[in-house]
């Protein structure tokens, strides 16, 4: 009985710490809002064939990737026509392991650079994000 009381006391003491760790790691989408790369001005875009969006700096990409809750059933991946391993991409990106994230994207897609430009991710992976369905704004993927 004494051992049980000691165990229970320790558990009650560390439970708030465990909850804080879980919230900091798994529920970042509550604290960090959705953000997309800024679009270039229309006047400039009409004069060239460059990207529509400005570059998404790696710090912002890491921050947005960290919003992924790594849900049990990744609807983003289910709704991807290539079945890209999106949750793992996001995890690697959030950890700053961009080369590994790129290599992972190449394992299911021979031309991820092209796909990233023409894929309607707002209707596919981002549009089916569990976080989007909960009202917190989708994880920015493309």
For the regions a protein language model found, what residue spans apply to each?
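Charged/polar low-complexity intrinsically disordered segments
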Residues: 10, 17-20
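Ferredoxin-type iron-sulfur electron-transfer modules and their immediate structural context
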Residues: 21-142
């Amino acid at each position: 009985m004494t051992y049980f009381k000691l165990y229970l006391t320790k558990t009650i003491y560390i439970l708030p710490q465990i909850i804080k760790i879980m919230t900091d790691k798994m529920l970042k989408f509550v604290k960090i809002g959705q953000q997309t790369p800024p679009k270039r001005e229309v006047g400039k875009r009409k004069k060239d064939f460059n990207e529509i969006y400005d570059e998404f700096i790696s710090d912002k990409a890491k921050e947005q990737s960290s919003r992924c809750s790594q849900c049990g059933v990744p609807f983003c991946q289910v709704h991807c026509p290539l079945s890209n391993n999106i949750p793992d991409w996001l995890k690697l990106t959030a950890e700053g392991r961009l080369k590994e994230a790129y290599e992972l994207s190449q394992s299911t897609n021979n031309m991820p650079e092209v796909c990233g430009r023409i894929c309607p991710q707002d209707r596919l992976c981002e549009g089916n994000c569990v976080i989007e369905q909960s009202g917190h704004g989708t994880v920015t993927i493309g």
